[in-house]
UniProtKB/Swiss-Prot annotation:
One of its GO terms (molecular function) is steroid binding. The gene is MAPR4. Disulfide bonds: none annotated. It is found in: Membrane. SUPFAM superfamilies: Cytochrome b5-like heme/steroid binding domain. This is Membrane-associated progesterone-binding protein 4. Belongs to the cytochrome b5 family. MAPR subfamily. Induction: By auxin. Its main location: membrane. It comes from Arabidopsis thaliana. Residues 45-138 are annotated as: Steroid-binding.
Amino acid sequence: MIPARRFLLSPFVGVTFIVVLVSLYFRSSFKSPQHQYQKRLFSAEELALYNGTDETLPILLGILGSVFDVTKGKFHYGSGGGYNHFAGRDASRAFVSGNFTGDGLTDSLQGLSSSEVKSIVDWRGFYSRTYTPVGKLVGRYYDSQGNPTKHLKGAEAKASRGAQLMEKQKTEEAKQSNCNSRWSQDEGGEVWCDVGVPRLVQRPLEIAITGSMSKRCACFEEDQLDQSGLEIYKDCEPLAKTCRV
């Protein structure tokens, strides 16, 4: 049996100790950028540094104040990429507006409908599932302590309301089947019903969902045609099953 003193002084123990130290050193030295930025609070000026122009830095993107590392999507988010306009900033509005220049690249959701705000919240969910969250952007949606602001809570509430209205509209419209439709450049469009006749009807929840009114084509039986709000297609016979549009 090797005496304790001889064991502690043996070359084998010394080499093992050095290997362990080196291992710990490299483990601490090569932490991923995602780990280094975890739970960090960014200012707008700081976030702008991670816009893909400096290849030594990760590429970060903000949406509703949540910041994600999108470096693995460098082809899209890096300099010259199709989505580079989102890098280094929170351009939440542009996810639904399609305005990728000037004032369009803003985190303000003012004037957007509940369905549009829901789409932005859904986009945030996509980034949460696909990329690594690395912190919060101090400003409109998070305060200097990293707590959600009234703007974030309001956006999430509006998105939730939009989801409820869309589900309600889907349920209501399922009660009256949609018309069949087709369109070609040569012949134009037409709508038809396998059962019943086509009528244009208002979508009553649409203004609350999208901010504007719209109509859809639905099929009605003859004994339902006395309902208010049913519109006959122009130049179409009242009981025709097919109408040109």
